[in-house]
Amino acid sequence: MTEAMRSLEAAFLIGVEGVTEVWLVRHADCYEGMSEGADPKLSPLGRKQAELLANRVRKLDVAAIYSSPYRRALETARTIADDVHVDDRLIEMEMELGENGALDFKELPASVIERMSAAIDDIAQAHAGGRVIVVAHGAAMIVFLTHLLRLEPGHLRFLPYFTSVNVVRVLGDRQMVGTLGDTSHLE
């Protein structure tokens, strides 16, 4: 590898000692029988997705697993391992489905960014240099990833698929997106 390539990788926290690798994972499918305001359990498809994710993660050295307190996230995380840390800051963005079918967000993106950033920072600091799995929710993840990519809110036209892996590398106050939407475990 050339010196230029090593420098480029270091700039993106690839192969840098002490980097914490946070796997930000969207929960598995839960939409069978979901009603507005519900905290649904995983659907049969979601349980299969969670098991495929668990098979992938079990091959890795994982320092800890964190989850939103919502049932769909907890069930996904507990399919991987029994020992799951719950963090309320990982909850979904507050929203409702409007009359015209559009989403009506009840929580400002700045609030989501603040709580998600604080959660990821705290988790990364607690497991410095390790790999951590964080199971959360689609809209909150999009807002957080949009912020990390330095895009304006609404400019990341991407919906993480169920159990997709989004890798964020953290070192000190630096957070770099390494992977978006990896679903190779579902193939």
What name fits each language-model region?
Residues 2-84, 108:
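Active-site-proximal alpha-helix that buttresses catalytic centers in soluble enzyme cores
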Residues 22, 122, 128-139:
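Generic beta-sheet signal
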Residues 30, 140-141:
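Short active-site segment of divalent metal-dependent hydrolases/proteases
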Residues 38-44, 78-122, 178-180:
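Phosphate-handling substructures
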Residues 51-58, 113, 117-125:
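Generic structural signal for well-ordered alpha-helical scaffold segments
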Residues 67-68, 114, 135-136:
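Short beta-strand scaffold positions
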Residues 79, 143-147:
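Active-site signature of alpha/beta-hydrolase-fold catalytic machinery across serine-
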Residues 152-176, 186:
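Domain-level recognition of soluble alpha/beta enzyme cores
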